[in-house]
A protein has these predicted regions:
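A short SAM/SAH-binding and catalytic strip from SAM-dependent methyltransferases
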Residues: 106-117
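S-adenosyl-L-methionine-dependent methyltransferase catalytic module, highlighting the catalytic core
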Residues: 3-24, 51, 72, 117-125, ...
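A short, highly charged, low-complexity intrinsically disordered segment
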Residues: 235-243
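Active-site acidic short loop of glycosyltransferases
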Residues: 38, 101-102, 118, 132
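N-terminal non-cleavable signal-anchor helices
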Residues: 78, 130, 183, 242-243
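Conserved N-terminal segment of class I S-adenosyl-L-methionine
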Residues: 1-100, 106, 123, 194-197, ...
Length: 243
C-alpha cells in the first residue's frame, strides 16, 4: 500500500472522534510528567487525535507552544490543531523529519512503531532530533502477551480484521525485539512500565492497583501495551555502530 493510500485509510479512521485516552497513555503520564521541565520541548510522532498532548496542556504540565507533533492523517492533524492552535502540529513523514538536530527533550512514539513499514530509518530520524540525554517513550502491542497473540492469529486465519482493527501495516513485535531495534538506533533502554495484563475481555476489570502490583513484580514485559523508556546518550558518548 502506498503512503497516500495509508493516509487515506487513517483519514477515514479519524473521522470518528475517539473519546477515551488509551491505557498506554494513562500508564505513561506519571513518568512523563516527572521528566518534564519548564524548558522541555516535546514531539509526538503519530499523534492521532492528540489525547496525551491535550491532557498535558489542560493540566498545565507543559506550555502549548512547546508541543510539536506529526501524523500522516490530515484529518487527525486538523482535529488537534483546532484544539491546540499554539502547538506545532503538522502532517509529516517520520522518515524525513523537518526539525533541527537535537531539538527535542522528549519524543513519544506510542502505538506507532508496529505500523511502520521500515522502523529502522524512522528511529534514526527520531534519534537525530532528540537532544543529548533526551528521552524516547515508546509503546506497542507486545505479543509476549499470549491472549492477544491468539486473537491476532485467529483474526488473520479466519479473515476477521475487525476483531483487532487491522491497519494497513500491522506488525507483530515482542519486548526484546523492540528494545534491540531501538538500541540499534542509538538509544539506551532504561525501564518498562506495564499496561493491560489480562485478556481483552477483562480489561475493564484491571484496576490501577492491580496494574501497580503486577508492575512491582517486574512483569511489565508480559503486559500487552508496555511503555518503554529510552534515553539518548549525552555529549561525548559513542555513536551507534552501523548495522
Amino acid at each position: 500500500m502506498t503512503q497516500a493510500k495509508e493516509a487515506a485509510w487513517y483519514d477515514e479512521f479519524y473521522q470518528q472522534v475517539q473519546k477515551q485516552m488509551g491505557a498506554w497513555y494513562r500508564a505513561l503520564i506519571p513518568d512523563l510528567v516527572s521528566e518534564l521541565r519548564p524548558e522541555s520541548k516535546l514531539l509526538e510522532l503519530g499523534c492521532g487525535q492528540g489525547h496525551i498532548l491535550r491532557y498535558l496542556v489542560l493540566e498545565k504540565k507543559i506550555q502549548e507552544e512547546s508541543i510539536f507533533a506529526i501524523d500522516q492523517s490530515s484529518a487527525a492533524v486538523e482535529f488537534v490543531k483546532n484544539l491546540l492552535p499554539k502547538a506545532g502540529i503538522a502532517t509529516g513523514d517520520i522518515y524525513r523529519l523537518e526539525y533541527p538536530r537535537e531539538f527535542f527533550n522528549i519524543c513519544l512514539l506510542m502505538e506507532t512503531i508496529e505500523h511502520l513499514e521500515e522502523p529502522a530509518p524512522a528511529l534514526k530520524q527520531v534519534f537525530e532530533v532528540t537532544a543529548p540525554n533526551g528521552l524516547l517513550y515508546l509503546s506497542f502491542p507486545n505479543f509476549l502477551h499470549l491472549p492477544w497473540l491468539l486473537v491476532r492469529i485467529l483474526s488473520e486465519k479466519l479473515n476477521q480484521p475487525n476483531w483487532i482493527v487491522l491497519q494497513p501495516v500491522d506488525k507483530i513485535y515482542t519486548v526484546p525485539c523492540v528494545i534491540k531495534m531501538v538500541e540499534r538506533a542509538g538509544f539506551k533502554f532504561e525501564k518498562g512500565i506495564g499496561c493491560s495484563y489480562g485478556p481483552p475481555v477483562l480489561y475493564p476489570l484491571e484496576t490501577p492497583g492491580l496494574t501497580k502490583a503486577l508492575n512491582a513484580l517486574k512483569l511489565w514485559w508480559l503486559s500487552f501495551h508496555p511503555v518503554l523508556r529510552f534515553r539518548k546518550p549525552g555529549q561525548g558518548a559513542s555513536s551507534p555502530v552501523a548495522q
